[in-house]
Amino acid sequence: MWNGKKKAVTFSIDDGVVQDRRAVALLNKYGLKGTFNLNSNYLGQGGLTTWLKKVVSHSKVEASEVKDLYKGHEVAVHTLTHPHLEEIEDEAEIVRQVEEDRKKLSELCGYEVVGMAYPYGTYNDKVVKCILEKTGVKYSRTVKSTYDFTPQKEDLLRFHPTVYYVEKCLEEVVDKFLATETDEPQLLYIWGHTYELDAELITWEAFERVCQKLANRDDIFYGTNKEVLL
């Protein structure tokens, strides 16, 4: 349990794009917490991306704002440059991508970064072994939705989230979580990218509606990924 509470909610948001500013404001408004997974080599860079034929900003937040922007939340590793780690043959390069990102982000934030999300959600046994043996990362998130609320207590370098927030079943999953009554611990872990909200894969209004539903519940612990997993 979490501080005596049987339920916990956490968010995980990738890439460190400027739309995170709006998402952080919403999470703060409703007393929710999240973990933001950043590529330190890309901080401050501009860019665009296309989703559902809609061009949206993929510009990254500035390094100078990371500490204050994500205050009260958690910053975590997303590697230096967002490669497919499982395609890298050189183990030293896998370690460099992860550990140098972790160290740079730790310096920016003023605390030791210990979490991670895999770029593209992809990995293999070699990647996991490198991270386990040669980095300071304690957990790493995949992109495989479980739609289940049973907390994963083992193999945290292959941690699977509950639901991706662009999935049509998001609100159904949230409602099911809220309605579940059990003596067993229950974790709702929601992940995504905030530029997807601009692309309206899920609207900002729908995202806020989910935040409203989850907020101000006496039986729920609101924490970062680190706080609910470690």
Q: Which role fits each region the language model picked out?
A:
Residues 1-19:
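Boundary/entry segment of secreted carbohydrate-active catalytic domains
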Residues 1-2, 29-31, 40, 106-107, ...:
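C-terminal domain-boundary segment and adjacent tail
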Residues 10-11, 74, 220:
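Hydrophobic "anchor" residues on beta-strands that sit immediately upstream
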Residues 12, 77, 145, 151-182, ...:
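Glycan-processing catalytic domains of CAZymes
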Residues 13-16, 79, 194, 225:
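Active-site metal-binding loops of divalent metal-dependent hydrolases
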Residues 22-26, 126-131, 210:
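A short acidic, amphipathic alpha-helical/loop segment
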Residues 24-29, 58-70, 175-181, 211:
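Short amphipathic alpha-helices and their capping/turn segments at secondary-structure boundaries
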Residues 30-126, 146-147, 152-158, 186-197:
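Metal-dependent polysaccharide deacetylase catalytic core of the NodB/CE4 family, i.e.
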